Swiss-Prot record:
Annotated function: The subtype gamma methyltransferase (M) subunit of a type I restriction enzyme. The M and S subunits together form a methyltransferase (MTase) that methylates adenosines in the sequence 5'-RAACN(5)TAG-3'. Methylation protects against cleavage by HindI. In the presence of the R subunit the complex can also act as an endonuclease, binding to the same target sequence but cutting the DNA some distance from this site. Whether the DNA is cut or modified depends on the methylation state of the target sequence. When the target site is unmodified, the DNA is cut.
One Pfam family linked to the record: N6_Mtase
Superkingdom of the organism of origin: Bacteria
Keywords for this protein: DNA-binding, Methyltransferase, Restriction system, S-adenosyl-L-methionine, Transferase
Biological process (GO), any one: methylation
Protein family per UniProt: Belongs to the N(4)/N(6)-methyltransferase family.
Note: Type I restriction and modification enzymes are complex, multifunctional systems which require ATP, S-adenosyl methionine and Mg(2+) as cofactors and, in addition to their endonucleolytic and methylase activities, are potent DNA-dependent ATPases.
GO molecular function: DNA binding; N-methyltransferase activity; site-specific DNA-methyltransferase (adenine-specific) activity
EC category name: transferase
Recorded catalytic activity of this chain's protein: a 2'-deoxyadenosine in DNA + S-adenosyl-L-methionine = an N(6)-methyl-2'-deoxyadenosine in DNA + S-adenosyl-L-homocysteine + H(+)
Quaternary data: The type I restriction/modification system is composed of three polypeptides R, M and S; the restriction enzyme has stoichiometry R(2)M(2)S(1) while the methyltransferase is M(2)S(1).
Species assigned in the record: Haemophilus influenzae (strain ATCC 51907 / DSM 11121 / KW20 / Rd)
Gene (UniProt): hsdM
Residues holding S-adenosyl-L-methionine: 117-122, 146-148, 173
Official protein name in the record: Type I restriction enzyme HindI methylase subunit
Length: 443
């Protein structure tokens, strides 16, 4: 890192008077220029960050505000952090990573629906990574947003005493600002990556067209209606059928299958409609993918997990070389999780472990059992008999109701009596309302 771009240099020089001599030559002309020059030096020293760092001077931020931010960050203990007076055993790189992730999540909450292009809730990212277990190989996200799946992959590997150098990170992103967010996310954590030469559309300008990937994870925009280009009409990626021009769900799925290595695995977040839609060739594409025995597991998610959409979602897990041929595991997780506030649901660590452990037990046949209303192992024949619909609720059934010992006839008698009481109360209230309206002259 060049001397002029180190934090200590910014801290010491930012308090100088305009015109003062700089330690590395030249004169001090303001904090914004100082920071921009530091960005220039960083990009010159790191080719991958060229054009990524936004210049401060373009935002006309007050000089005193910039000085205050530098002082605030300088007073923060990144090297010896504490929480509630107790030391936190994390390195400076990890702390900075958490800070960056925190701001992304807060921006996502503030942005609401617009945040979907760059942010996937951490609990969903954690669930997918725990289920896929990307210990080594090529990891790819064709709709990477700010790179959350890559960050969680690093955490997963570290937690299991692995080596991050055993994975290669590949990603692509259409939005230029989001592409830069992802690059900065990797740089802060020291993760090497290949995001292509520039931001680009994964369908019309694939940056990794010849690469085969071992783990592919993605959360693309649900039901994207504006993805089609006539150049895609005879694309070799549509091996299971041409996706409808008005919905990109099965375009994403087939794009990912195309890039799958012989032992590769996929986790793809899609709208629930992808599991049952029969319109515009989607049913035929799903049928072909099922018959190819690529689908390994389907997970139905609870609502209110996302800041940007209320569309019910699911996760498709595909495996090019799954152990249990001719079978699919269905998991209905719609009742799992807790409300973290009035509008958003989240998973606990135990929730994530329950879902992930169910898949792993099923894969190894080690202690797995079907559980009514939660999980079910179904054969391809059963799926065929259900018209190739992959909705977990159709297979897992409902939980058995505990017998309370009250005879059915007695229950019906009590319910009927309660209903009569409610009808009578309703009639009484209706009469009272009419009386009040009449008193106001509204017969």
């Amino acid at each position: 890192m060049p001397a002029s771009a180190r934090w200590q240099a910014l801290q010491e020089v930012s308090i100088l008077n305009t015109g003062a001599e700089l330690p590395w030559g030249g004169k001090f002309s303001g904090v914004a220029k100082l920071i921009d020059d530091a960005f220039d030096a960083i990009e010159k020293d790191n080719e991958k960050l060229k054009g990524v760092l936004q210049r401060i001077s373009g935002y006309a931020v007050n000089e005193d505000t910039l000085r205050g931010l530098i002082i605030l960050f300088s007073d923060t203990h990144f090297t010896r952090p504490t929480y509630n007076g107790e030391p936190v055993h994390l390195g400076a790189k990890d702390i900075l990573g958490h800070v960056y992730e925190y701001f992304l999540s807060r921006f996502a909450q503030a942005e609401g629906k617009r945040s979907g292009q760059y942010f996937t809730p951490k609990s969903i990212v954690s669930l997918i990574v725990e289920m896929l277990e990307p210990y080594s190989g090529r990891v790819y996200d064709p709709a990477m947003g700010s790179g959350g799946f890559f960050v969680q992959t690093e955490r997963f590997i570290t937690a299991h005493q692995g080596n991050i150098n055993n994975v290669s990170i590949y990603g692509q992103e259409f939005n230029p600002t989001t592409w830069k967010l992802a690059a900065m996310n990797m740089a802060i954590r020291g993760i090497d990556y290949d995001f292509g030469k520039y931001n680009a559309d994964s369908f019309t300008q694939p940056q990794h067209i010849d690469k085969k990937m071992d783990f592919i994870m993605a959360n693309p925009h649900f039901n994207d209606k504006e993805w089609w280009n006539e150049s895609l009409a005879d694309d070799p990626r549509w091996a299971y059928g041409t996706p409808p021009k008005g919905n990109a769900n099965f375009a994403w799925l087939q794009h990912m299958i195309y890039h799958l290595s012989p032992n590769g695995k996929i986790a793809l977040l899609l709208a629930n409609g992808s599991m049952s839609s029969q319109t515009n060739n989607e049913g035929e594409i799903r049928k072909a993918i099922i018959n190819a025995d690529l689908v390994e597991c389907m997970v139905a998610l609870p609502g209110q997990l996302f800041t940007n959409t209320k569309i019910p979602a699911c996760i498709w897990f595909l495996n090019r070389n799954k152990k249990r041929k001719g079978e699919v595991l269905f998991i209905d997780a719609r009742q799992i999780g807790y409300m973290k506030d009035r509008v958003l649901r989240d998973f606990t660590a135990d929730d994530i472990a329950k879902i992930a452990d169910t898949l792993h037990a099923w894969q190894t046949s080690d202690g797995y059992e079907d559980q009514a209303a939660f999980c079910k192992s179904a054969t391809l024949e059963e799926i065929k008999n259900n018209d190739f619909v992959l909705t977990p609720g159709r297979y897992v059934g409902t939980a058995e109701q505990e017998d309370d010992g009250v005879p059915f006839a007695e229950k019906m008698q009590n319910l009927t009596a309660l209903l009569k009481e409610q009808f009578a109360k309703s009639a009484e209230l209706e009469a009272e309302i009419k009386k009040n309206l009449g008193g106001l002259g509204y017969e």
